[in-house]
Amino acid sequence: MGEDELALLNQSINEFGDKFRNRLDDNHSQVLGLRDAFKDSMKAFSEKMSLKLKEEERMTEMILEYKNQLCKQNKLIQEKKENVLKMIAEVKGKEQESEELTAKIQELKEEYARKRETISTANKANEERLKGLQKSADLYRDYLGLEIRKIHGNKLQFIFTSIDPKNPESPYMFSMSINEAKEYEVYDSSPHLECLAEFQEKVRKTNNFSAFLANIRKAFIAKVHN
């Protein structure tokens, strides 16, 4: 074989080697590309499956929670049903007691109305009596130096003057009212008189109010001179 033929053979061998290596490089690149694509696909599939599993777990938990809630609701409904049935039975068993209670309430209402009317009548009578006392006060004022004022609590305040000759305008006073028993009730005086309780007892027995006022005035005069 001549040199030209050897050179041509070597050239052919080299060209074939280059083509083979290029083909191997291309195949290797394709294999690597396929491997990477497969990895990406598997990763995406794995993530998708993981999300799906988590979603299924969440749905399972929700279903279990719903079942638990449903059981609780059913239990509560059953308890309420039993309570309602019990209440119905109690109501049916207490119909007579309810009627008696209604009658008792009506009786109490009527009694309250009677008492309210009695109190109202007593208050009106007391007001009329106080008005009478106030009217009498106008007469006493000119002759005994007495002034009568209505103060809080439906009380009357009796104020005497011309008791002390040295100070005729100096006030001497006591207060009184008519209690629920329609009796005179005397309160403290200024200055204090030890005989107030005695005078109160006497006017309750005699109902002589003029004498009562005269005795109070005399007691104040005696206190000034003593």
Curated annotation (Swiss-Prot):
Residues 72-128 form a coiled coil. The keyword Phosphoprotein applies. CDD domains: RWD_Spc25. Keywords: Cell cycle, Cell division, Centromere, Chromosome, Coiled coil, Kinetochore, Mitosis, Nucleus, Phosphoprotein. It is found in: Nucleus; Chromosome, Centromere, Kinetochore. Residues 147-226 are annotated as: Interaction with the C-terminus of SPBC24. InterPro entries: Spc25 (IPR045143), Spc25_C (IPR013255). GO terms for biological process: attachment of spindle microtubules to kinetochore; cell division; chromosome segregation; mitotic spindle assembly checkpoint signaling; mitotic spindle organization. The modification Phosphoserine is found at residue 12. Residues 1-146 are annotated as: Interaction with the N-terminus of SPBC24. The keyword Zinc does not apply. Residues 1-58 are annotated as: Interaction with the NDC80-NUF2 subcomplex. Its main location: nucleus. One of its GO terms (cellular component) is Ndc80 complex. It comes from the Eukaryota. Component of the NDC80 complex, which consists of NDC80/HEC1, CDCA1, SPBC24 and SPBC25. The NDC80 complex is formed by two subcomplexes composed of NDC80/HEC1-CDCA1 and SPBC24-SPBC25. Each subcomplex is formed by parallel interactions through the coiled-coil domains of individual subunits. Formation of a tetrameric complex is mediated by interactions between the C-terminal regions of both subunits of the NDC80/HEC1-CDCA1 subcomplex and the N-terminal regions of both subunits of the SPBC24-SPBC25 complex. Belongs to the SPC25 family. Acts as a component of the essential kinetochore-associated NDC80 complex, which is required for chromosome segregation and spindle checkpoint activity. Required for kinetochore integrity and the organization of stable microtubule binding sites in the outer plate of the kinetochore. The NDC80 complex synergistically enhances the affinity of the SKA1 complex for microtubules and may allow the NDC80 complex to track depolymerizing microtubules. This is Kinetochore protein Spc25. It comes from Mus musculus.
